């Protein structure tokens, strides 16, 4: 399996009348308006969730100059399972979730949630966030011992650890499979997300 360094959050429209309306618009190549998204019922996660709140809020900010806090019809779900149940029942029109979530809830959709069609037929992606980078091993920019040679050697050491079976066992405690090199610009979206969170916290 090829290692990935990031994932994306998706805004998924469900089988409600509004959900279908938004999906049809996006699938026709039209851009959603603020009126489109603000008139929908949204399911979001708690405010510390990257895929269920932070990055969808960043997407709203980049596309409409708004945040999740500006959505008049947003409810917080206690889990992705309950969010998908609400989407299936039509209680919400859009849910914010991680990119692989539909695969994870495919069986529940036609089982526990009682839907006739598959989750793939009943739902559609109406928004995609910037990349959410996975965990990072970072070093201090101000430490005098952190010269370029040391940084490169440290990075290569972690990559080497992740390339051995023994190393994989050690890093499995973090749910890591291995490491790949990164550059500072990979985390620009994360910096923007953190700035947005700080501005929301200071406004509240």
Region spans (language model):
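Solvent-exposed loop/turn segments at secondary-structure junctions
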Residues: 17-19, 47-51, 81, 100-104, ...
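A ligand-binding cleft/hinge motif common to bilobed small-molecule-binding domains
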Residues: 61-62, 88-89, 93-120
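Periplasmic-binding protein-like
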Residues: 1-10, 112-155, 172, 176-181
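Second-shell loop/turn segments in exported
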Residues: 41-50, 73-74, 141-144, 176-183
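Hydrophobic residues within well-ordered alpha-helices
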Residues: 37, 87-88
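Short helix-initiation/N-cap motifs at beta->coil->alpha
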Residues: 67-85, 131
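An extracytoplasmic/periplasmic, membrane-proximal ligand-sensing/linker region
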Residues: 146-204
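A conserved helix-loop-strand patch within extracytoplasmic ligand-binding domains
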Residues: 1-50, 58-61
């Amino acid at each position: 399996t090829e290692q990935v360094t990031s994932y994306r959050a998706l805004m998924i429209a469900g089988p409600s009348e509004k959900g279908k309306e938004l999906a049809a618009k996006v699938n026709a190549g039209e851009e959603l308006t603020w009126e489109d998204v603000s008139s929908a019922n949204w399911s979001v996660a708690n405010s510390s969730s990257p895929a269920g709140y932070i990055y969808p809020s960043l997407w709203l900010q980049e596309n409409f100059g708004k945040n999740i806090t500006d959505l008049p019809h947003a409810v917080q779900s206690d889990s992705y399972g309950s969010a998908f149940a609400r989407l299936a029942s039509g209680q919400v029109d859009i849910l914010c979730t991680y990119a692989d979530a539909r695969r994870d809830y495919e069986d529940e959709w036609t089982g526990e949630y009682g839907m006739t069609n598959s989750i793939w037929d009943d739902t559609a992606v109406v928004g995609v966030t910037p990349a959410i980078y996975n965990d990072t091993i970072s070093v201090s920019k101000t430490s005098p011992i952190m010269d370029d040679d040391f940084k490169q050697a440290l990075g290569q050491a972690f990559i080497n650890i992740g390339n051995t079976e023994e190393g994989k066992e050690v890093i499995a405690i973090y749910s890591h499979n291995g490491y790949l090199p990164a550059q500072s610009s990979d985390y620009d979206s994360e910096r923007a997300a953190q700035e947005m969170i700080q501005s929301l916290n200071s406004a509240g």
